Each structure stands twice: as structure tokens, then as C-alpha cells.
């Protein structure tokens, strides 16, 4: 039976960047890795209601720089930056080095696989019909410019005695095309009948040029003024 490789893992270094970017000596590598894991675990727990998409970590010169990608930056920052200052102190204590926290806003949460999966899971926990939740997520993603999306839910759907899986797809989701920009993530819905798993694949288009193309900032197209033809009248 064929199995699916993780869409991010197979594309690392091709069209997907690493979530942690640092170099370390052999004796420091394990400590840094454990620190990254604990920092992410802490932030995901503290910011459970802040619509956090992903957390990227860099370690420049005996310090740690954490970038939180969220659809609701106001909740993370707090009143006059009080909440983000508390997070910075907590992260510095966990990592054991000075910490810097940056907040990056997710402009289109409907095109982010993590946020879509979390949204479907929260709807399932509120007893929304799973087909309605799946279809709504697919329609919103396609409306905002996704080239394709696939959503799968697994478990005791609708309180059924026997667990099963159902999926819904629109557009194309080329999992074998390595230059395809595919966002993938999962979530869990804890219902009275048990846990329902949610998986989301979103195809945003193909990236030509690999990681070099990702590093370059996007250039906004400049609208050139249209030339108005002059009539041939008497001078």
C-alpha cells in the first residue's frame, strides 16, 4: 500500500526553508535542538488562541531570535507590548541566552495549512458538520487564489461506531512535483466521541529557481501610463 511522504520534508532545501537556522559544534547541537523544541512547545501552549501559523528560530552570536508568524498579531503583542515582553523573558530563561522576538503577520490565513486545519478542528469541536467545515475551508482557499487544496478528516465522523476517513479536493495538488509550493499541516479535534484528525494540503503554485527565488523580495509590478493616440487634425 502506497504511503505519502511529508510534503515539507521532501522539499527542504529545494523550495522549503528550515524552521530552525543555526550552526553548532557537536557538543552544543543537542542542547540547541532541545532548546528549540522547548521554546516551540512553550509558545504554542501560551499562544493557543492567537492563530499561530509557524515559529522560526535563529541563533546569531550566543543569542536566540524567534519569529512568530500569526494571523492575530495584536493578541501576541498585547497592550503596549506587555505580553511580548513577558514572552521574551520566558524564552530567554528557557534557552539560557538573550532572546529577541519578532512578530510577522499572516496576511491570508485562508491560504495557511496550519490555520485552516486548526479552524476545521475547532469547528468539529463545536459540533459543526464535518462536510460543511471541509467544504467551507476549500471554498475560502480557492476564492483567495489557491491553485488547489485537499482536506482529509479521519475518526468517528458524526459519532459513527466505525472510524473512517473522508476527503475533499478542489483544483490540483501535485505531491510529486518538487518545485510545487505545497503547504501541509495537521490538527486534532477532541470531541465527545474521540479524537478526529485533520490534514490539509494547499497548492499555491510552482516556484521556478528554487531557494534562490525565495530569497529575492517580490517585485511589485509597476503600471505604466497608457499612451493616448493623438488625432490627425489641422495644426
From Swiss-Prot:
What ranges does the record give for the region Disordered, renumbered to this chain?
216-235
Biological process terms in GO annotation: translation
Zinc among the record's keywords? no
State the source organism's domain of life.
Bacteria
Listed GO cellular component terms?
A: cytosolic small ribosomal subunit
Free-text function comment from the UniProt entry: Binds the lower part of the 30S subunit head. Binds mRNA in the 70S ribosome, positioning it for translation.
The record ties this protein, via HAMAP family, to: Ribosomal_uS3_B (MF_01309_B)
Kindly provide the name given to this protein in its UniProt entry.
Answer: Small ribosomal subunit protein uS3
Amino acid at each position: 500500500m502506497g504511503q505519502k511522504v511529508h510534503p515539507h520534508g521532501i522539499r527542504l532545501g529545494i523550495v522549503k526553508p528550515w524552521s530552525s537556522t543555526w550552526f553548532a559544534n557537536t557538543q552544543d547541537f543537542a542542547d540547541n535542538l532541545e532548546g528549540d523544541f522547548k521554546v516551540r512547545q512553550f509558545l504554542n501552549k501560551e499562544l493557543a488562541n492567537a492563530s499561530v501559523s509557524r515559529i522560526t528560530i535563529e541563533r546569531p552570536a550566543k543569542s536566540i531570535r524567534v519569529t512568530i508568524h500569526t494571523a492575530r498579531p495584536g493578541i501576541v503583542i498585547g497592550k503596549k507590548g506587555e505580553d511580548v515582553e513577558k514572552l521574551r523573558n520566558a524564552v530567554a530563561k528557557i534557552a539560557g541566552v538573550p532572546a529577541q522576538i519578532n512578530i510577522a503577520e499572516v496576511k491570508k490565513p485562508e491560504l495557511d495549512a496550519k490555520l485552516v486545519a486548526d479552524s476545521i478542528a475547532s469547528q468539529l469541536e463545536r459540533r459543526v458538520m464535518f462536510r460543511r467545515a471541509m467544504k467551507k475551508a476549500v471554498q475560502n482557499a480557492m476564492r483567495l487564489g489557491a491553485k488547489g487544496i485537499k482536506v482529509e478528516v479521519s475518526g468517528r465522523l458524526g459519532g459513527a461506531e466505525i472510524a473512517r476517513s473522508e476527503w475533499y479536493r478542489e483544483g490540483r495538488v501535485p505531491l510529486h512535483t518538487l518545485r510545487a509550493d505545497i503547504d501541509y499541516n495537521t490538527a486534532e479535534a477532541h470531541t465527545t466521541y474521540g479524537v478526529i484528525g485533520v490534514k490539509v494540503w494547499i497548492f499555491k503554485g510552482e516556484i521556478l529557481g528554487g531557494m534562490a527565488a525565495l530569497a529575492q523580495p517580490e517585485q511589485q509590478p509597476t503600471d505604466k501610463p497608457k499612451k493616448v493616440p493623438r488625432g490627425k487634425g489641422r495644426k
